[in-house]
Amino acid sequence: MKVSAALLCLLLIAATFSPQGLAQPDAINAPVTCCYNFTNRKISVQRLASYRRITSSKCPKEAVIFKTIVAKEICADPKQKWVQDSMDHLDKQTQTLKT
């Protein structure tokens, strides 16, 4: 009986100090893409295929990553008007394709 109680205590202690990474969902451990520099040039909407927003707290800046029709990814500042206009254009294009 003493052996099983000691074993139970040992298991509880081991569980308390075990790494929490094993209990986290896969998305938390997924790599994060961050933008450290933004393009200085406006990109023509005809060259853009899609975009995604980067809002992770692990990144130093919020950003938009545009993907061009030749699969190149370009970081842009979401505060700039041309970036917002390009996102709106791509959103409308996507909605048109869905309907």
UniProtKB/Swiss-Prot annotation:
Domain of life: Eukaryota
Signal sequence bounds: 1-23
Name of this chain's protein: C-C motif chemokine 2
PTM sites of type Pyrrolidone carboxylic acid: Q24
Family matches, as SUPFAM superfamilies: Interleukin 8-like chemokines (SSF54117)
UniProt keyword terms in alphabetical order: Chemotaxis, Cytokine, Disulfide bond, Glycoprotein, Inflammatory response, Pyrrolidone carboxylic acid, Secreted, Signal
Compartmental location: Secreted
InterPro entries: Chemokine_b/g/d, Chemokine_CC_CS, Chemokine_IL8-like_dom, Interleukin_8-like_sf
